Amino acid sequence: MVRLILVTIITCMLCVPSTFARSFVVPLQANGTVHHIDKDSIQLAGQSSTMRMVKATMAVKSPKYEDIAYITYFYKYDLINRTIQKKPIILYMGTKMPYTYNSPYLDVSVVGSVDYIYANYAYYKEFGSYFSQDMIDRYGSTDLSTNK
């Protein structure tokens, strides 16, 4: 009986945090794919007088497949030219073996695109303000997430 209670407590301790710990941004849809960003994964990855870098993990789910891919992006913010670049690093697809995908940096320049909004959101969560003026004009200081 004691073992059963102990197993139940340990199971709850392992399952409950993994179920409720992650909180996501409002889902955005682009090209038939639903994206979410894991707020808990956003963290500073580096900074200098001319650049800031933020790491964020995204869940990408296609309506065609049951698998969810988890992609870790490094967003590089050029403080002088006011440009954003992204670099996808790791892709996990469902229960398959993870593999590393090391891409070159890609420009995030389409205003209003999913990548643009997420890059600005990651910056907002780390530094308290949006990186791009049009995001400030559009959202003010409003948090885009569903869970404030």
Per-segment meaning from a language model:
Residues 7-15:
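Bacterial N-terminal signal peptides
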Residues 19-148:
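N-terminal secretory-pathway/extracellular module detecting exported/lumenal segments
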Residues 1-4:
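Positively charged n-region of N-terminal signal peptides that target proteins for export
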Residues 6-7, 132:
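Short amphipathic alpha-helical segments that mediate assembly, nucleic-acid/protein binding
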